[in-house]
């Protein structure tokens, strides 16, 4: 039995789900971040993070490790390019999505979903815009060089980037026809894929079911890459203030 400890809003869980769907692998998905699932998630991942894949008793945590396991165990319909150079590039894009892109989007959006009405530190939005624009430019070049997808054929690069890039418009940093025509075309083609249509529909259904039901949060769980981006961008004092105010929590070891 294959079980995916999932959450429809987690970009990492969304990536894994799309990989499983792309490969045609059956699985049972559960929203492991729901309060009633907390104990089950803790039993397989004490950090209480999703996704986790239980493949008939083989338990894998961390989305990149899950994808690597699935690719090796079920090589049909690969998500890693066969060409070694393109494979390295695809893995690099996955890593960039999982670290830099996730950190930017999390650290900006936390003021929308966690503490609505609160004021972000001065300069945070500008730092996010600068780094996102640089990433868009790199993607534009990658699509010009490789096409039709980020690393030639559809790969983990596309499936890792897509969940994050579905949210950038809401943050006020969209990619545009004028400045990023190839990236916009890529995004539109991604949204037409069955696995991406299903992904977007699950997110929309999840958000609609919870509209107006956002609980008040006392603290946010922060982890490495999300903290690293803040510190690298010079927001040390703001983050120290959050720690002193008791609004920062850390994942379990």
Report residues per predicted region.
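GST-like fold's C-terminal all-alpha helical module
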Residues: 97-192, 198, 231, 251
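Juxtamembrane helix-loop transition sites at the ends of transmembrane segments
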Residues: 45, 119, 179, 215-216
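Charged/polar, low-hydrophobicity segments characteristic of intrinsically disordered regions
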Residues: 192-209
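Long, charge-rich low-complexity segments
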Residues: 204-238
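Short capping/connector residues at structural and topological boundaries
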Residues: 58, 84-85, 154-155, 180, ...
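Residue-level detector of family-conserved "landmark" positions at structurally sensitive sites
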Residues: 30, 63, 178, 200-201
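GST-like domain detector, emphasizing the conserved glutathione-binding G-site
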Residues: 1-130, 150, 226-253
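A generic membrane alpha-helix/interface feature
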Residues: 42, 49, 116, 171, ...
């Amino acid at each position: 039995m294959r079980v995916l400890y999932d959450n429809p809003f987690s970009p990492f869980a969304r990536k894994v789900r799309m990989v499983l769907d792309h490969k045609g692998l059956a699985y049972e998905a559960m929203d492991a971040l729901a309060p009633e699932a907390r104990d089950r998630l803790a039993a397989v991942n004490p950090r209480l993070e999703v996704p986790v894949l239980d493949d008939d008793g083989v338990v894998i945590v961390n989305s990149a490790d899950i994808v690597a396991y699935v690719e090796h165990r079920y090589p049909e319909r690969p998500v890693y390019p066969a060409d070694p150079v393109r494979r390295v590039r695809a893995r690099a894009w996955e890593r960039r999505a999982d670290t830099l892109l996730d950190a930017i989007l999390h650290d900006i959006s936390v003021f929308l979903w966690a503490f609505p009405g609160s004021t972000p530190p001065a300069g945070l939005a500008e730092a996010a815009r600068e780094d996102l624009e640089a990433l868009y430019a790199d993607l534009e070049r990658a699509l010009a060089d490789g096409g039709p997808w980020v690393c030639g054929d559809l790969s983990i690069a596309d499936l890792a980037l897509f969940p994050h890039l579905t949210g950038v418009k809401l943050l006020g940093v969209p990619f545009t026809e004028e400045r990023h025509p190839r990236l916009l075309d890529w995004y539109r083609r991604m949204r037409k894929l069955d696995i991406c249509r299903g992904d977007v529909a699950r997110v929309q259904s999840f958000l609609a079911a919870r509209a107006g039901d956002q609980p008040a949060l006392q603290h946010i769980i922060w982890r490495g890459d999300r903290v690293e981006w803040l510190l690298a961008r010079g927001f040390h004092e703001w983050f120290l203030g959050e720690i002193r105010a008791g609004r920062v929590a850390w994942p379990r070891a």
